[in-house]
Amino acid sequence: MPPKLLVSTRNPHKLREITAIMAPFEVELISLDAFPDAPDVDEDRHTLEGNAIKKACELHILTGLPTLADDTGLEVMALDGAPGVRSARFAGEEADDAANRTLLLERLQGADDRRARFRTVIALCTATGTHTFEGICTGTIIREERGGHGFGYDPLFQPEGHDLTFAEMAEQVKNAISHRGRALQTLARTFDLAMLDSAPSESAP
């Protein structure tokens, strides 16, 4: 049987993206839905790296499974890197994606410099240690939303060298160039997934 890998998310969009990218590897991905009593990890660190490591390690300790966790931030040059680590909570702790996008457009109203980048840090916590992998995708924030795919800031982000926003792209096209895709590709190139077999089997759901 393939080794199990817990993905620290209940977000179906994110899980689908990670599953598609990890499809070539002999790994059984398990979402947090398999652990309904697992508490949400408080993302209270000041960096993407800190949040990713905290989530991966806390859930690895809780479940005994190797755990993959990530944190992603949209860094806008004209806003001095904001929303950054607070991207998911840009418009408030209870804000949804639409509210975050609306606030971003308001903050950029009249701005000529609309350069931005998505940055993802993935942390993989196993019985033998913790490793981090980074992926970056540069682009611009357009002036109005386009596209119905994706999630988060995807309808506003047009990656460099492309005429479409992330939300207008087919899933496989986005996965090939996205920040999360690049971070996962770095993981795949530099990490031996066979070590996931070291996870204690009795912890599997």
How would you describe each model-predicted region?
Residues 2-6, 10-205:
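Anionic-ligand binding patches
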